[in-house]
């Protein structure tokens, strides 16, 4: 059944079903996906609707009812075909050819008001041919965590998928890493693309360069449209993907975010952050911080993220080399570190209050900041928030005024580094007039919100839901994240 034949598709009174759904990926043919059926749930309770995304889809939040979300994204009425995408991937360094959408599917693709194509992908919508013995479901806690991660990262300026909605579905689930039975949910993830590095790796595994080229042409036409008419569009695509991924991981690092599971099947071909599992925001600066309890050797620890993303880009060259020149891809990848460092330095300087500094000043300040954070083990997010909260023009007068009203207390042995940092910050401020001091205060406030999505915050929010069915802390936390308070 094609989209045009979908029952009630164009004439539906449900605004979410009346969107201008496109069949860009479906038109590639069934070498890339399987048609699947959605699970039927005993209950549908709308727990989250992301009204901030609706105007981008040309919808008025006041017009779209809660029941519309449930009908479209909980009961999946009026939408066919539903497509489970096929892909493989390197998981913790080992190739896995048994992957694919195991608990979700591509619900549809929508051209937004900005002209960009967005994918609606489900999570927790039931079994598919790739469920590998799993139930295809999503725990309610898993849904809550993904909503929070996506909103937090988006409002920190990280390029990320967003959660359009989350619906509790009334099924008891059994999990080894949660008290069970636990509650269930289904969610809709709005992302720039459902296609992963692993989508190409699967085609290479089956030795289908024809399908690889067809998919790559599709990716460029839909997500790198500015390159579609270029003679060297393939190598230009790879070069831009390198830049996007390098900048993305720099955004994670500056935000203190650890993705936890950077397998190639969790890497988006558009260079967007998505697929949030056991992620965590670091409590203190520790390059060895591990977010996933099953990452026994720390492969995906916080400090390894840049090198792992670079490695994944290098492994992507294998399926692409049937179309792209290997040497040209290597030349593009060599710029990864340059892109990463430029983005990371820019973001960290903004967290320190500066839109720009001379290279010697910037390098010295960043190096000393990281050294202090590492040795002192003060709260990573607390340090930057305290800078924003206590910043004063008096910091320019004497080094002793810098951070003197903050709650930052270095551990014994780190006070000397902290003194050096205060002296350097004071010295840099001496070069700024009063107008530029005001800009520093504004920059600090914008880039260092009070609310940090640390694990105790998430667990406290979940405890209220699990024990009392109290959702107020969840909504208040999202409000704080969105308002950057």
Swiss-Prot record:
Q: Known catalysed reaction(s)?
A: L-seryl-[protein] + ATP = 3-O-(5'-adenylyl)-L-seryl-[protein] + diphosphate; L-threonyl-[protein] + ATP = 3-O-(5'-adenylyl)-L-threonyl-[protein] + diphosphate; L-tyrosyl-[protein] + ATP = O-(5'-adenylyl)-L-tyrosyl-[protein] + diphosphate; L-histidyl-[protein] + UTP = N(tele)-(5'-uridylyl)-L-histidyl-[protein] + diphosphate
List the taxonomic lineage. Bacteria, Bacillati, Cyanobacteriota, Cyanophyceae, Nostocales
Q: InterPro entries in the record, alphabetically?
A: SelO (IPR003846)
Question: Could you tell me which Pfam families the record lists for this protein?
Answer: SelO
Q: Where does ATP bind?
A: 100, 102-103, 123, 135-136, 189, 196, 275
According to its UniProt entry, what is the function of this protein?
Nucleotidyltransferase involved in the post-translational modification of proteins. It can catalyze the addition of adenosine monophosphate (AMP) or uridine monophosphate (UMP) to a protein, resulting in modifications known as AMPylation and UMPylation.
Give, as one word, the top-level EC class: transferase
User: What's the EC number here?
Assistant: 2.7.7.-, 2.7.7.108
Q: Which cofactor does it need?
A: Mg(2+); Mn(2+)
Binding sites annotated in the UniProt record for Mg(2+): 266, 275
Q: Active site: which residues?
A: 265
- The protein in question is named Protein nucleotidyltransferase YdiU
Can you tell me which family this protein belongs to? Belongs to the SELO family.
Q: Domain of life, per the record?
A: Bacteria
Q: Which GO terms describe its molecular function?
A: AMPylase activity; ATP binding; magnesium ion binding
């Amino acid at each position: 059944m094609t989209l045009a034949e979908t029952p009630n598709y164009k004439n539906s009174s449900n605004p979410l079903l009346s969107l201008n759904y496109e069949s860009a990926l479906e038109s590639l043919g069934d070498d890339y996906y399987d048609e699947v059926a959605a699970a039927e749930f005993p209950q549908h309770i709308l727990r989250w609707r992301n009204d901030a995304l609706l105007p981008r889809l040309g919808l008025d939040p006041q017009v779209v009812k809660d029941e519309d979300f449930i009908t479209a994204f909980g009961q999946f009425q009026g939408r066919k075909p539903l497509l489970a995408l096929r892909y493989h991937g390197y998981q913790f360094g080992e190739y896995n050819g048994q992957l694919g959408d195991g608990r979700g599917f591509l619900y549809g693709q929508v051209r937004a008001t900005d002209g960009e194509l967005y994918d609606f992908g489900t999570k927790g919508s039931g079994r598919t041919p790739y469920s590998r013995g799993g139930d295809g479901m999503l725990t309610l806690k898993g849904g809550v965590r993904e909503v929070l991660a996506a909103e937090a990262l988006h409002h920190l300026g990280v390029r990320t998928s967003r959660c359009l909605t989350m619906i509790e579905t009334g099924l008891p689930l059994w999990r080894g890493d949660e008290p069970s039975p636990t509650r269930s949910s289904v969610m809709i993830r709005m992302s720039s693309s459902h296609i992963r590095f692993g989508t190409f790796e699967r085609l290479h595994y089956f030795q289908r360069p024809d399908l690889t080229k067809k998919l790559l042409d599709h990716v460029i036409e839909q997500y790198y449209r500015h390159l579609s008419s270029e003679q060297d569009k393939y190598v230009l695509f790879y070069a831009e993907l390198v830049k996007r991924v390098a900048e993305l991981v720099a955004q994670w690092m500056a935000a203190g975010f650890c993705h936890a599971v950077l397998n190639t099947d969790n890497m988006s071909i558009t260079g967007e952050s998505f697929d949030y599992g056991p992620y965590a925001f670091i409590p203190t600066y520790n390059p060895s911080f591990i977010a996933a309890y099953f990452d026994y050797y720390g492969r995906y620890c916080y400090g390894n993220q840049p090198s792992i993303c670079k490695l994944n880009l290098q492994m992507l060259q294998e399926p692409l080399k049937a179309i792209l020149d290997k040497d040209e891809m290597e030349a593009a990848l060599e710029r990864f570190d340059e892109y990463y460092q430029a983005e990371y330095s820019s973001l960290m300087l903004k967290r320190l209050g500066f839109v720009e500094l001379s290279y010697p000043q910037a390098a010295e300040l960043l190096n000393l900041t990281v050294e202090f954070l590492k040795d002192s083990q003060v709260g990573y997010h607390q340090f930057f928030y305290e800078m924003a909260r206590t910043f004063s023009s008096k910091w320019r007068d004497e080094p002793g005024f810098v951070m003197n009203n903050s709650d930052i207390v270095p551990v014994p042995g780190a006070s000397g580094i902290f003194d050096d940092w205060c002296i350097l910050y004071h010295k840099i401020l001496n070069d700024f007039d009063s107008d530029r001091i005001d800009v520093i205060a504004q920059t600090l406030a914008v880039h260092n919100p009070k609310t940090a999505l640390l694990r105790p915050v998430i667990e406290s929010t979940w405890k209220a839901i699990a024990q009392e069915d109290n959702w107020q802390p969840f909504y208040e936390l999202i409000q704080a994240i969105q308002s950057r308070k």
